Amino acid sequence: IDERNEIAGSYMGVAQLDVGMRTDVMETCPKDLGIMMVLRSMSPNVIVTDEIGNEKEIKALYTALNGGVSLITTVHGDSIEDILHRTELKRLLDGDLFRKVIILSSRNGPGTIEKIYDLQEKRWYFGN
């Protein structure tokens, strides 16, 4: 679900970035609505979204996860502590819904992996 054309870089409905074969891109659609639409009509194995943050988006993520769909999503923040200060996101990370948190920066170029944290094992795999 590419609400702001940040994942596939779509232009006139065509992905400009290689997001893989057998990938459908729903662009310029609010994430909460897009998630519900693809759940009802596409039977996805995985849903990827750009950054989440509001209660409607988080509710849609719970619906997808409860339906057995795997998720890859982003959250913007300065640190894990910054993100955990946001009530909605803290609930997501405190639950058993996500397994890993990957902290990225642009230190060595966009997408530099700084840290990987396993939420279930409560340990850092990389970076600490």
Residue ranges, per PLM feature:
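P-loop NTPase switch/communication element
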Residues: 1-38
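Acidic side chains
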Residues: 2, 50-51, 118
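A broadly conserved detector of short glycine/acidic/proline-rich loop/turn motifs that flank catalytic sites
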Residues: 5, 29, 53, 107-108
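Switch/connector loops and helix/strand junctions flanking conserved nucleotide-binding motifs
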Residues: 7-10, 81-83, 109-113
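Conserved P-loop NTPase nucleotide-binding/switch module
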Residues: 16, 42-44, 48-102, 106
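Short, low-complexity, polar/charged sequence segments that are solvent-exposed and flexible
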Residues: 17-20, 91-93, 120-124
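Conserved P-loop NTPase
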Residues: 99-128
